[in-house]
């Protein structure tokens, strides 16, 4: 009996020791698992980041499929849904990674320390209990042996004690066996508890993974949709066919986008605000195939079909051939606030009706006057735009005449359908003109109806001059034709030069938005340079400019003269009374960038001062004094021969048109000469109009250079009457003589500083 119990206890003890040994030997396995789980979690975090970046790119592809014409909205929608499902999978993957570190790895590391303590404690408790039970059994067994020895000696009263001792020994063995069994149970429970704990830690991780993988099942439906949408790549779906059908009959047109002609709207210059007010009308009213250089238009080179629509365009437009904005007090607002007298000015001498092919010239009395233009009198070209029916008010000085001929929407990279070279269409006028009975009568400012009915003049006019001998006149005309040809061809030379010279601003700088004073940072270096002579201060409201294309032959004669000292700009140079003619598109002199620093503009009083653009003095035509007006050339076909094909016919009114001296710079110039002194009527034989090059030469020659030898060269140009100028002076010598520079004082910071 005892041997059987002893054997059983020994087996239980061995089992316990095996269990404890297994638990202690499992620690490296748990540690390796924790290590590998940490690496997996790290890779999952990297995968989450990569998946997020991948899905961002995937979403862009889906958006592109939605917005492009080739990809339909159905494909884009399916791809978007696919991306959304993947984003949900990515979110579940992120949660799975978090659960792996929070619910499994970290708790398992903490639990392992507890497991080690419990296993050691179980082993110690088992050893203690086993030792105690063995000691008790040994003691009882020793007592039983003593009683057995006494019973063998023949003592009969010892037998009951012996039986009791044997029972105690048996009980101790049974207790030992039970103790061993309890120890084994505890060891097994502990070992099982470890796995149960591990499963409890792994369950949330598995749940997150199942949730993540559950999202994948939604991809099957989306994949089937994409397969059906892209079944036949070579067949257009109905939605794409509808795009083609919707395009029919619409006015949608486009042109290749080229580099911008102006700075951005945040740093745009003088024409930004004015052009932003009419950018919608101007973009819709351009002729087909042409481009707009409006700086505030979002699509700068957008064209529309004029044949389908002819909307009303604002009279204040961005002048393309001068680069300045015609300022209209009623229609547009200047980028910089002007003084109260600023509405009575033209910023460049460019007519508000620059899109029309004719100019309505009011009576040339003393002072400025508003002039109403009835819409019924307009005779636009095929490509011109009808003006509004209401009257536009602008002021035109006596002696100013708008002569710009190039439409502002013209694409300067190539000539338009109506922009033939002027030299091919000029006709020489050698016939004498008949006397004009209206030439001697003074015209006052009280006759706007007469101006509305009679003053139908084309933009390109010639300046009336004294009669010259036929041979000299022919030679001058030859020179004029050569010069005008150089100007005309130079205008169409390249889009770069025309953009630089015509748009009025070349690069984005930090100069005030109203100024034109900049040395371009691009290749072409167009600068604005004043060559004004003596001037008076009672004509400050005229805003004038004078530019010459850099590559023209005219500018070469002034190049050496201006090499020494030149300002970077004369955008703020004040203009005063003097025989000046302003030609916005054609007077910039080409040169290398000046070393003189440009002075920035300051403010005086409450608002900024008006911008005074450069002017060039011009020799007053040599005609006798006239009491109040300039002579008017008669109507006739010979006047028509001086214009380009765009010019309408002259002589619309029943009476002679009051003329103003102006120069036609190959259809690009507008003239703002000041009011001349009273002049008497001149005979008809003296009303032989000189060609445009003579007016150009007169514009280049300061009055001080054209006085007779008996006059003092330093005399004020205003004091020189037209009769003081010699009539027979050679125009070629006048060109060679060049331009005299005169120092002027101004408080405008953008004005040049002459040392």
Swiss-Prot record:
Superkingdom, taxonomy of origin: Eukaryota
GO biological process: actin cytoskeleton organization; adherens junction maintenance; cell adhesion; cell surface receptor protein tyrosine kinase signaling pathway; cellular response to fluid shear stress; epithelial cell proliferation involved in renal tubule morphogenesis; glomerulus morphogenesis; microspike assembly
Molecular function GO terms recorded: actin binding; actin monomer binding; identical protein binding; phospholipid binding; signaling receptor binding
Regions crossing the membrane: none
Residues bearing PTM Phosphothreonine: 258, 425, 603
Compositional bias annotation for Polar residues: 656-671
Gene Ontology, cellular component aspect: actin cytoskeleton; cytoplasm; cytoplasmic side of plasma membrane; endocytic vesicle; ruffle
Phosphoserine modified-residue sites: 261-262, 271, 322, 644, 647
Compartments it resides in: Cytoplasm, Cytoskeleton
Record domain WH2: where: 727-744
Coiled coil: 108-155
Domain notes: The WH2 motif at the C-terminus binds to actin monomers.
Subunit structure: Binds to actin. Binds to the cytoplasmic domain of receptor protein tyrosine phosphatase delta.
Name of this protein: Protein MTSS 1
Gene that specifies this protein: MTSS1
